[in-house]
């Protein structure tokens, strides 16, 4: 079974003036810590909501030129037995590179394995049907398609 795991990270950012700047720096900082080892981890801004009214808040909390930014880190974990196993693997892999940054698993979604195979089969059958529908063309048309535009003038002469 393959799973898509979304982990929330609370990234501290220092000496910032605005929430937008804090988010940009947090994404950059997290990307530097994860790459090149985990370049398959997707980094997104986190969604925060007010616990009382449900209003959407910015992903960065800013106070005294310091910020705490909520980021969502998404990765796919392959060949796992259970959802909990996928969550542990994702937390371990990401947590090893993001030292002293708290992580919380937000979502675990099982990825259906059959959809990849059927998509490939459908696309290959669609290509073969398109090839069958094309009428046979002249040999001269094939030759002109193979020639680069820079050399067409030389052939015409």
UniProtKB/Swiss-Prot annotation:
Residues 105-157 are annotated as: Disordered. It comes from the Archaea. This is UPF0212 protein rrnAC1165. InterPro entries: UPF0212. Coiled coil: none annotated. Residues 106-157 have a biased composition (Acidic residues). Belongs to the UPF0212 family. It comes from Haloarcula marismortui (strain ATCC 43049 / DSM 3752 / JCM 8966 / VKM B-1809). NCBIfam families: PRK03922.1.
């Amino acid at each position: 079974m393959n799973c898509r795991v979304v982990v929330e990270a609370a990234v501290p950012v220092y000496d910032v003036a605005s929430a937008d700047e804090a988010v940009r720096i947090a994404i950059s900082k997290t990307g530097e810590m994860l790459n090149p080892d985990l370049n398959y981890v997707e980094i997104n801004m986190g969604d925060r909501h007010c616990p009382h009214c449900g209003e959407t808040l910015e992903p960065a909390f800013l106070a005294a030129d310091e910020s705490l930014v909520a980021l969502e880190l998404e990765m796919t974990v392959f060949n796992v037995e259970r959802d909990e196993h996928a969550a542990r693997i994702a937390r371990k892999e990401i947590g090893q590179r993001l030292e002293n940054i708290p992580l919380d698993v937000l979502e675990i979604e099982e990825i259906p394995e059959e959809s990849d195979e059927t998509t490939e089969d459908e696309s290959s059958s669609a290509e073969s049907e398109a090839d069958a529908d094309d009428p046979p063309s002249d040999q001269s048309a094939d030759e002109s398609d193979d020639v680069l535009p820079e050399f067409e003038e030389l052939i015409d002469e």
